[in-house]
């Protein structure tokens, strides 16, 4: 009897082995977690204008549209002054990834909304290369009926740690105006930022045949929510002509900037 039970058990094991060989089990294919949903970022800023009124700007951009390798760029914006006058509105589209980026911006200035009649007056295109410490870009701005500007720039990270960051940028712009007055702009800028959201910048620009202009600016984070979705910044800046026909002329501005990162879909 015991031999019969042992024989039956052996036959059962062999049968199960045959079934397993004939119908092998497939391991479940791991499903990657879903990527972060797109996030809408709304930015509003108000700044003083030396000619009167307050300059107001609104920009809506979308982030997390791509993946870890490629990120599309999409934003719309509008700028105006509280005293009235022209309103600038436009849109930017582009793509960036692997240290490369390209974008195109179309804008229009008019005194009223024309609905779907979107005829750009200013067209901008940019091609940028960004590495860990060095970067370069070329851009072209065509202001229809006014000017054509071609700009080349190189940037470098001078210093960086967990709290402090210092970048340096040099550039040259060739400006051709439709009225025949052409000139070059060459200059440089230092840009410092702190991990807490504070920053300072200073630059010097030479306008060929005109003179030199110095610029300084700063910003400070006044408020930031615990989740980082809402922040309020104060900024201030000024410029002064150091030489040329505009020598000693100054311009100042102060403002506030509110940024909100909305929820994804």
Swiss-Prot record:
BP terms from Gene Ontology: defense response to bacterium; innate immune response
Location (main, coarse): secreted
Localization, UniProt: Secreted
Keyword Signal attached: yes
Domain of life: Eukaryota
Keyword rRNA processing: no
Keyword vocabulary terms for this entry: Amidation, Antibiotic, Antimicrobial, Immunity, Innate immunity, Pyrrolidone carboxylic acid, Repeat, Secreted, Signal
Propeptide span(s): 23-24
Residues spanning the signal sequence: 1-22
Gene Ontology cellular component annotations, sorted alphabetically: extracellular region
Induction profile: In response to injury of the body wall of the larvae.
Record-listed Pyrrolidone carboxylic acid modification sites: 25
Modified residues (Glycine amide): 264
Distribution of this protein across tissues and organs: Synthesized by the fat body and is eventually secreted into the hemolymph.
Misc. remarks from the entry: Sarcotoxin II consists of at least four structurally related proteins named sarcotoxin IIa, II-1, II-2, and II-3.
Function statement: Sarcotoxin II is an antibacterial protein which plays a role in the inflammatory response of this insect. The main effect of sarcotoxin II on E.coli may be the inhibition of cell wall synthesis, including septum formation.
Family of this protein: Belongs to the attacin/sarcotoxin-2 family.
Designated name of the protein: Sarcotoxin II-1
Organism of origin: Sarcophaga peregrina (Flesh fly)
């Amino acid at each position: 009897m015991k031999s019969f039970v042992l024989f039956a058990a052996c036959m059962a094991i062999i049968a199960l082995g045959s079934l397993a060989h004939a119908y092998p089990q497939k391991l479940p294919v791991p499903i990657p977690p879903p990527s972060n949903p797109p996030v809408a970022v709304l930015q509003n800023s108000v700044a003083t204008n030396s000619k009167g009124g307050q300059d107001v700007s609104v920009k809506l951009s979308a982030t997390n549209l791509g993946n870890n390798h490629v990120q599309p760029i999409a934003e719309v914006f509008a700028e105006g002054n509280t005293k009235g006058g022209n309103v600038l509105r436009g849109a930017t589209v582009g793509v960036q990834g692997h240290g490369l980026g390209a974008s195109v911006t179309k804008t229009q200035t008019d005194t009223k909304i024309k609905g779907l009649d979107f005829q750009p007056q200013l067209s901008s295109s940019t091609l940028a290369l960004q590495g860990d410490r060095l970067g370069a870009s070329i851009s072209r701005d065509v202001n229809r009926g006014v000017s054509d500007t071609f700009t080349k720039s190189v940037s470098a990270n001078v210093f960086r740690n967990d709290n402090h960051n210092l970048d340096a940028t040099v550039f040259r712009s060739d400006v051709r105006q439709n009225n025949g007055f052409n000139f070059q702009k060459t200059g440089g800028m230092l840009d410092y930022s702190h991990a807490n959201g504070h920053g300072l910048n200073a630059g010097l620009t030479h306008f060929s045949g005109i003179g030199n202009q110095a610029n300084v600016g700063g910003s400070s984070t006044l408020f930031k929510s615990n989740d980082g979705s809402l922040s309020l910044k104060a900024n201030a800046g000024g410029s002064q002509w150091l030489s040329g026909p505009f020598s000693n002329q100054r311009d100042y501005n102060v403002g506030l900037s509110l940024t909100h990162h909305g929820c994804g879909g």
